[in-house]
Amino acid sequence: MALLHSGRFLSGVAAAFHPGLAAAASARASSWWAHVEMGPPDPILGVTEAFKRDTNSKKMNLGVGAYRDDNGKPYVLPSVRKAEAQIAAKNLDKEYLPIAGLAEFCKASAELALGENNEVLKSGRYVTVQTISGTGALRIGASFLQRFFKFSRDVFLPKPTWGNHTPIFRDAGMQLQSYRYYDPKTCGFDFTGAIEDISKIPAQSVILLHACAHNPTGVDPRPEQWKEMATVVKKNNLFAFFDMAYQGFASGDGNKDAWAVRHFIEQGINVCLCQSYAKNMGLYGERVGAFTVVCKDAEEAKRVESQLKILIRPMYSNPPINGARIASTILTSPDLRKQWLHEVKGMADRIISMRTQLVSNLKKEGSSHNWQHIIDQIGMFCYTGLKPEQVERLTKEFSIYMTKDGRISVAGVTSGNVAYLAHAIHQVTK
């Protein structure tokens, strides 16, 4: 009690001599966070919120990055339902996973990405850890670079890139740079610009590459272009950091979608790789991903794994178990794996079909523009080439929602609304 009274006395004395201190203490007591400003809304979530408020029966949400069936409904893969039933029947426990995750899931993920007969897997010169989907894989990778990549803090991102790449690497303490990627004049790959910029990247820097289905443009290099990019990356001694969120979902063929990653490794480039099962298995809310580092030898891989575990432990201790069990069950069960590959191809084919139907309907509308880029691009997203003012008209006049850069999620297009979309686009572009 004496201490309490003496503390009040000293506080009163301080306030008497320094009125400002009393005011500061009072403000602090009322709110520790008065200085915190309102953050900007997420642009994609903002699109969804505006869509929900719209009462137009023909409204379309082309901003969401999740697959929809041809009725515009969320889609749970039948193979996932079967895997869930098998897991439930085993009456498994809910104990913690190891820090690195479910071992059989990690092994199966590496095999899916690199190919089952890859020399890297046979020699054991790799490490794969389970992560909290692709975002978690990127953050673990970025944090590993920040702590152990001693050559440079610079990470070169394609321009444009997925919006979350920037804060992930920035918040991990890396410095952000860019290289040319998308050509707005052709709505295609700026191969010349990309090669010129990559050639000028300082040696021992990090370059981020989208393995397939580039987000947000849907523009991918062709195999011969990938070969030249790999040559430049190797010549300049750059570290290749691959983000592969759409394996199988881009072309419908998982091996084709992983071609660039495998080619780089074949050329002697020891890459790291982020994987996600959100899109290709529809496990969005399960948060299932993996991070792989290809090393010089098995001994180096063990050292890298030990440090990845040390990074993971204070972040989230260990990853969630349910989604990893689902993915692992599918990948390691021959019948389920075969069914899943068929379903992935079905999703990819529907998106490819919607691209073709959209262009066909634009032609029927009498559009004189060249829309071939919509067909040439690949994956869930499409850079339409629409200008911000045209996007605004689509929203106001037709209740069609997308981000201001004209990016659309083709998964939101169905056989029931593709004609309406084509009509609206024609009206704002003619």
From Swiss-Prot:
Reactions that this protein is recorded to catalyse: L-aspartate + 2-oxoglutarate = oxaloacetate + L-glutamate; L-kynurenine + 2-oxoglutarate = 4-(2-aminophenyl)-2,4-dioxobutanoate + L-glutamate
Keyword Membrane: yes
Residues bearing the modification Phosphotyrosine: Y96
Modification N6-(pyridoxal phosphate)lysine, positions: K279
Subcellular location field: Mitochondrion matrix; Cell membrane
Biological-process GO terms, alphabetical: 2-oxoglutarate metabolic process; aspartate catabolic process; aspartate metabolic process; biosynthetic process; glutamate metabolic process; lipid transport
InterPro entries in UniProt: Aminotransferase_I/II_large, Asp_trans, NHTrfase_class1_PyrdxlP-BS, PyrdxlP-dep_Trfase, PyrdxlP-dep_Trfase_major, PyrdxlP-dep_Trfase_small
Pfam families given in the database record: Aminotran_1_2 (PF00155)
Cofactors, names only: pyridoxal 5'-phosphate
Residues bearing PTM Phosphoserine: S143
Residues engaged in binding substrate: G65, W162, N215, R407
First-level EC class: transferase
In-chain residues carrying the UniProt-annotated modification N6-succinyllysine: K73, K90, K107, K122, K159, K185, K227, K296, K309, K338, K363, K396, K404
UniProt modified residues of type Asymmetric dimethylarginine: R313
Modified residues (Phosphothreonine): T48
Miscellaneous comment: In eukaryotes there are cytoplasmic, mitochondrial and chloroplastic isozymes.
Subunit structure: Homodimer.
Main function: Catalyzes the irreversible transamination of the L-tryptophan metabolite L-kynurenine to form kynurenic acid (KA). As a member of the malate-aspartate shuttle, it has a key role in the intracellular NAD(H) redox balance. Is important for metabolite exchange between mitochondria and cytosol, and for amino acid metabolism. Facilitates cellular uptake of long-chain free fatty acids.
Protein family according to the UniProt entry: Belongs to the class-I pyridoxal-phosphate-dependent aminotransferase family.
The protein's name: Aspartate aminotransferase, mitochondrial
